[in-house]
């Protein structure tokens, strides 16, 4: 059954690539109502770009047991299967969006492109040299925009890019990289000032995409960083309430207050700018507190890893610790590894982004943006 599933996946993939090649050899033809999906961000959104850069295994997931439940092989996604953008693409009736750096990436990008890089942040300095930072991801998007202008002309490309939707997830690694690299809880002496820099970089990237023609944007905010298994392992026994009061979770909340303020400001400044913002922080805390309410059995311990909460980042045995545990039923868990959701949890978050009400997603959801 597993081999049949893989075969079907590859048949679909090669069919799409063949269509792309045919299009690239003739005139590019895009349906008038086609809305593509462009993706920027970190490991929550990365579908394998880090497979193609010189980095460390901590920033890669191209080994088992990653990818085992859906693809039946590791794809570079930090999940047992699909990640959030995969489900968003499905809901938008688009095929899976390949990583931009994949050699057979969509040649004309009529469905969009995924630039996300695991471990990256909004700041160039965050894990510099081992990831593709948000600014570089934006520069890759500009290359795509330039190609589209050659194929469609300036007017056609602008119209296509205006119909498209851009989803962005950034910030978590900027805070985590600093706070977990330094032993002192005072590693960020001016938290609000640091948040302002991160938010400023995200704003700059949004405006760059807007200048190219982008008008419809989707965002998820930063999760409760100290409540991830990888962080709770360091303070074993801390309650879910307590971990939200620790430094990284506290700065995440500062970020999450600043992000909507910035977006509202851009909405006033940029004509036609529309956005959707999903409260990933609250949605994740809700799953962790009440897993059974959403069909899970375990909300705090990871499925794959070792140590307390299975939070030692050993999943797959390729990151310096060879021994690791793998749970029996992955779908029972919110977390797959020490800091990433299972496919089932990712689908839950994607659904909130797609059709979520104002409790978690506002002022629009992604479905509304795609239909505009």
Kindly label every feature range from the protein language model.
Residues 2-372:
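Conserved active-site regions of diverse hydrolases
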């Amino acid at each position: 059954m597993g081999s049949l599933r893989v075969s079907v996946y590859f048949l679909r993939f090669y069919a799409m690539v063949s269509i792309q090649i045919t299009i690239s050899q003739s005139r590019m033809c895009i349906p008038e109502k086609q809305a593509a999906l462009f993706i920027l961000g970190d490991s929550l959104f990365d579908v394998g770009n880090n497979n193609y850069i010189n980095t460390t295994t901590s920033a890669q997931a191209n080994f088992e047991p990653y990818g085992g439940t859906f693809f039946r092989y590791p794809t570079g996604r930090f999940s047992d299967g699909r990640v959030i953008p995969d489900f968003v693409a499905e809901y938008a009736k688009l095929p899976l969006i390949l990583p931009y750096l994949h050699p057979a990436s969509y040649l004309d990008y009529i469905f969009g492109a995924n630039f996300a890089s695991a471990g990256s942040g909004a700041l160039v300095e965050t894990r510099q040299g081992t990831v593709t930072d948000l600014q570089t991801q934006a520069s890759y998007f500009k290359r795509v925009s330039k190609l589209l202008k050659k194929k469609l002309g300036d007017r056609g490309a602008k119209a296509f890019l205006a119909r498209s939707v851009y989803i962005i997830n950034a910030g978590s690694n900027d805070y985590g990289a600093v706070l977990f690299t330094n032993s002192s809880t005072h590693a960020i002496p001016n938290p609000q000032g640091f948040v302002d820099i991160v938010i400023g970089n995200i704003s700059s990237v949004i405006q760059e995409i807007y200048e190219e023609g982008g008008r419809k944007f989707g965002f998820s905010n930063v999760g409760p960083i100290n409540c991830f298994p990888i962080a709770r392992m360091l303070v074993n026994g801390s309650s879910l309430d307590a971990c939200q009061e620790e430094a990284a979770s506290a700065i995440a909340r500062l970020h999450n207050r600043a992000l909507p303020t910035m977006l509202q400001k851009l909405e006033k400044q940029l004509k036609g700018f529309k956005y959707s913002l999903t409260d990933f922080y609250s949605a994740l805390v809700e799953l962790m507190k009440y897993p059974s309410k959403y069909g899970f059995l375990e909300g705090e311990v990871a499925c794959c890893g070792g140590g307390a909460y299975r939070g030692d980042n050993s999943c797959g045995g390729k990151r310096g610790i060879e021994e690791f545990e793998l749970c029996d039923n992955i779908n029972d868990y919110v977390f797959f590894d020490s800091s990433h959701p299972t496919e089932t949890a990712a689908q839950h978050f994607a659904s909130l982004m797609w059709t979520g009400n104002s409790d978690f997603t506002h002022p629009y959801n992604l479905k509304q943006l795609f239909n505009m």
